[in-house]
Amino acid sequence: MSLITTLARLEAVESGRARPTATVRHRRLTDRPLVLVPLTTAGEAGAPLGALVGTDREAPRLLAVAQPRDRDLRFAFLAELAEAVLPHIESYADVVEPAERGETDPATGKRVKVETELCVDAAQIVVPSRAGVEFVRLLGRSMRFRRTAEDDPDTPYPAPARVPLLGRWLTHYGERARVPGSSLLLACTDLLNRHWATGQSSLEDQHLGALLAWIDPPAGESGAEAALRAELARDASGQLLCPPAGPATDPDFDNRLLAPAIEKYDRARASLAAAEDGLAADARLAELTGAEREIRALLAGVLRPTWDAVWRGLDLLRELPEGARAEDRWTRDRWSFTAHRDRVRSGEPPQPRRDDAVTAARKLAARETAQAQLEAQEALDDPLVLAGRRLAGEAFIGEVSAVEMAYSESKRPSPRPLVTVRTDERPQLGEGVKVYRSLDGKPQTAQFAGYGPADGDGGAPSLVLRITDRMGRGKEPAPGSVPEPGDRIAWTLFEHDQRGGPQLPDAEETPWTHGGPPGGLEAAELPDPVTPEDLL
């Protein structure tokens, strides 16, 4: 936690209202996000109970499983979910624009530009909390390997046709959510926590109702009071006025309302199966339909407050202007979306259960690079975030007091002007340390050359920086490429554009300890044989 965030939390406690930790919105919000509010069954890991899904805040689609332990009803739920989600995703897949990307020419080994297409936009999914993101990933893992009747006519429990496809998409979204700065799959609580600091703990910030109470409390009530009421207040029947954001449910709801309703449904279904004539069957069918409606009404009552809270959170976030570099991160999301669309359409198999060593290393390297890029871009977009880096000595703002032209000592001298900067801050500088500033949206590098004279009695010494790049190819610097006296500039000690690490070897050159050469991975996946020592 940065010092700025700590101060913001202290101010929130004192004022009774959440304090902003950002002046711009650092994540892209599309015009039509798909909001998904899921519920799971207590005691059944990953068993869906119900969901509200849709892009229209006034008309959500309710999906419910009357008996979560019934495999057929769970498959019916997944089929309904596919009908609700896949058309939204596919509506973005065919709207494309021409684009170029770099690829390695197999003949020459050089990087070349290749004409391709890029989806103009991508489908965005928003869930209430971080647990919802994990549930989406779990759903994808459980669905993408399902066999349909078309795949295998002899499979004992065939899945509906579109369920495996939805599983592949949800798996992709779940994996993409692990990339720092990605906006394909967002948790509302994480979004709000990124832009506001409350006076409660990070664990309490995962309660969507309490979080919104701190950010936008009712008139005449402090955030702490509103948050406490959101967490604990119950109605006359003992149910929470602000139900959990899911996917877990409140135990009192399970015990007092849901369990009796499911038992009633089970009895009605058993009675229908035992009916001996048509009249009795019609009566039992009416009872079964009524029991199912009761369960749907209970789930709707629990889900709707969370649904409204998610949209309220999105409204608060839309009041912030979008950060300048959020578009760049969204473009990478669009490339990811387009690439997965191409893999699905080309008939590639589903994502494997476990990544091989090379794929895992590439993912980790990409996420590390994305994390560094995100931290740098947020600081460049947001003065409040930059202030936190300045307090940590990782950036500083100073005024240029003098510029002295100098040149390198190479055979072809290049301009290396010395810029003297006055600042009251204490950046962590050492001899030869590189600093960076943004010049026309791209980084310009300078080296710390030493300290200059102090400004007045007892003042901090000035900093002397040597500009090293982005001044053109001429003997004299290009106009505007060198700061002028009086310019007030933000310098950072961190790079603005992170470079990737070294390339990993091909599969044929990968050591056997990491899955190669070809065929080694399959051998490594075989379990050890069971021996008598393994049995007690």
Where are the predicted features?
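Alpha-helical structural signal
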Residues: V114-P128, V133-L138, S142-S346, Y436, ...
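Short, surface-exposed beta-strand/loop "edge" segments at domain boundaries and coil↔beta transitions
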Residues: A42-L49, E58-L62, G132-R137, R426-E431, ...
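Structural motif
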Residues: V37-A42, Q67, V127-R130, D424, ...
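Conserved nucleotide-binding/hydrolysis modules and their immediate coupling elements
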Residues: L384-V482
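A broadly tuned "polar low-complexity/structure-edge" signature
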Residues: G50-T104, L184, L191, H195-W196, ...
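Accessory interdomain/linker segments of ATP-dependent helicases and helicase-like nucleic-acid enzymes
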Residues: L7-L10, L285-L429
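Long, charged/polar, low-complexity intrinsically disordered N-terminal extensions
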Residues: M1-A122, F135, R141-G181, L185-C188, ...
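C-terminal effector modules of nucleic-acid-centric enzymes and ribosome-associated factors
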Residues: Y436-D440, Q444-L536
